[in-house]
A protein has these predicted regions:
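Intrinsically disordered, low-complexity, positively charged segments
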Residues: 1-5
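Extended alpha-helical interaction modules
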Residues: 7, 11-131
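Membrane-associated alpha-helical segments
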Residues: 117-209
Length: 209
């Protein structure tokens, strides 16, 4: 049964709850592993370009009525398990999982690209063979393409518009998972990758003109 939309939040046999996020992340609450696997298997036909290895984020959620809501380490303390609260938690967890994927991908490409960027800055020439260089350009462009839509990571979830009282919980979760800081770090590396691609393409074009 559907409990809410944007993000889609549904009941899972158990009973439990799952949210299906626009980033392609599923967040489970109180769902047994066997039910998680069954739920994901049900979604499999609808998936396109799934990652070979899933990125997993975990957060313990404790319900403590009457106490201030807080986040301490890997534990979130909330007043109740209202769907809106679960959606806020799911939003941050999904962003964190997506950032983890981006961080790994960007880090591996950045390590390959940085020497090229340094050499370009130092001499203005393209090192290495042209075939290898074109492979690097293709790899860099693919990284940028996979990052499309990343700006949405810093946006607040829509659920806060109708539930402004939950903004404090969102801000605490966002800070605990360092969403803004991690996003900024990725942006810096992507900017270097982008400028390097632009410079390389200009140099390659001038060589063939």
């Amino acid at each position: 049964d559907t409990l809410a939309n944007n993000p889609l939040t549904v009941e899972v046999k158990g009973p439990g709850v799952a949210t299906l996020n626009r980033y392609g992340v599923v967040v489970f609450f109180d769902v047994r592993p066997v039910e998680e696997m069954a739920f994901l298997a049900h979604l499999q036909p609808a998936l396109s370009n799934p990652y070979p290895t899933p990125e997993i984020e975990e957060l313990e959620v404790r319900i403590e009525p009457g106490n201030p809501e807080s986040v301490k380490g890997d534990v979130a303390y909330i007043e109740n398990a209202a769907v809106e609260r679960l959606q806020v938690i799911a939003d941050v967890l999904s962003k964190s999982a997506l950032l983890s994927l981006y961080e790994k991908k960007v880090a591996s490409e950045f390590d390959r690209i940085e020497p090229l960027a340094v050499e370009l800055d130092r001499s203005g020439y393209l090192p290495g063979q042209s075939k290898e260089l074109l492979k690097k350009i293709g790899s860099m462009l693919m990284v940028e393409q996979r990052m499309v839509g990343r700006a949405e990571i810093t946006e607040k979830p829509d659920v806060l518009w109708d539930n402004p009282s939950l903004e404090g919980l969102y801000v605490r979760l966002e800070g605990e998972f360092e969403i803004k800081e991690r996003h900024t770090a990725i942006e810096r590396k992507l900017n270097l990758i982008s400028s390097t691609v632009h410079t390389v393409l200009e140099l390659v074009s001038s060589k063939h003109s």
